[in-house]
Amino acid sequence: MVHYSDFTVDSRIQRQARALAERGDRVDCICLSDDAEFDVGTGTIALHRAASGKPRGGARAYLEGNARFLAGAARKVSALDRRERFDLVEIHNMPDVLVFAALRPKLRGVPLVLNFHDTFPELFATLFDRTARHPLVRLIRAEERLSAALADGLVFVTDEARDLLRERGIAGKQTQVVMNTPDERVFGERRPAAEPPRSGELRVVYHGGLADRFGVETLVRAVAQLRAQGEPVALDVYGSDAEAARQLAALAAEVAPSGVRIAPQPTPVEQIPERLAAADLGVVPTMRDDFTELLLPVKLLEYVHLGLPVVASRLPVIERYFGDDVLLAEPGDAASVAAAIEGVRADPVAARARAERASQRLAGIEWRQQRQGYLGLVDGLVAAKRAG
């Protein structure tokens, strides 16, 4: 596997690597994590660092960071392939062009899977305020098509992402939707829905990315509004972006000095259930743009799995999968988020009923089902290679 991320906090990578290793496979992950090797089930996961980290800055620094990781990953893949003789290589975007890191095994006939975590053109346009017609965005669309054409199999996170890429002419010989649902081996079985407290402090939690598009500033302001009205609401925020955490902490000190705690630290996947154990409510305040309209946030699925009521932004994919079984708020509107949180406090019985219905919806897409589809794709490609 090749992925431009830290293995310890990337839940999608971990789930899929563990699914393979548990049944006896060896999985080499070329990533941003320190070199390490450990047994999982009857197999092994080995981590290989290909770059020191992601640079901060504008579009140029972002693309240069991608290029450096691609070069380092290509060297690692080639060296490991000489020794291990890979049966399959899986590339996790972004960027899509990481498929070229697997050029050596691809040339000797090894099947290549491109796993679309996100749609890169939409994300790049959102990050750097570019239009769809900007030359760089058009170039990224071209590399997306070329990268997909090199792959033997394509993996998508939702039906919506698959359908969008099909509209752009991207289709593989074999495709599979593998959703980001929590791994029962890490999170345990789905927990019974919890009823928020009728009195006393309501503990709200957010964990994950702290970039502007995740809307955490809106959530901080919403909690500040509630506290100004005398509502005993507290917010815990967990995120690994130190600079964004510093800015959010400064905002919290200004608008809600005693009610918001910003924890600027990564949350390893296996620690998420413990971190969220004291929470009464999970909030997913994602902003609306072309990129986020395609998202079904992992954190939302984790809150539902753990039995928490959820307040989430009114976004198309969230509405499709959960309807009114999560309380919906308008993206970027602190008053709307505050009203939704207040609604949980006002009627905890209804909040628990919604959480229970959301949990039942999750039952239809949980990881044990996604795992079967993922392993089926991998095994089919490897079998076809060996037969041909």
PLM regions: where:
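Nucleotide-sugar-dependent
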Residues: 10-11, 214, 266-275, 282-304, ...
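Carbohydrate-associated surface elements
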Residues: 33, 160, 181
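Membrane-proximal helix-turn-helix segments that form the acceptor-binding/catalytic region
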Residues: 104-107, 120, 134-154
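Acidic anion/phosphate-binding donor-loop and adjacent secondary structure
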Residues: 166, 181-200, 215
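Conserved donor-binding/catalytic core segment of Leloir-type glycosyltransferases
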Residues: 196-223, 236
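Nucleotide-activated donor-binding/catalytic signature segment of Leloir-type glycosyltransferases, i.e.
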Residues: 201, 246-276
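Conserved acidic donor-binding segment of nucleotide-sugar-dependent glycosyltransferases
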Residues: 326-334, 343-348
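A short, well-ordered alpha-helix in the C-terminal region of glycosyltransferases
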Residues: 343, 350-364
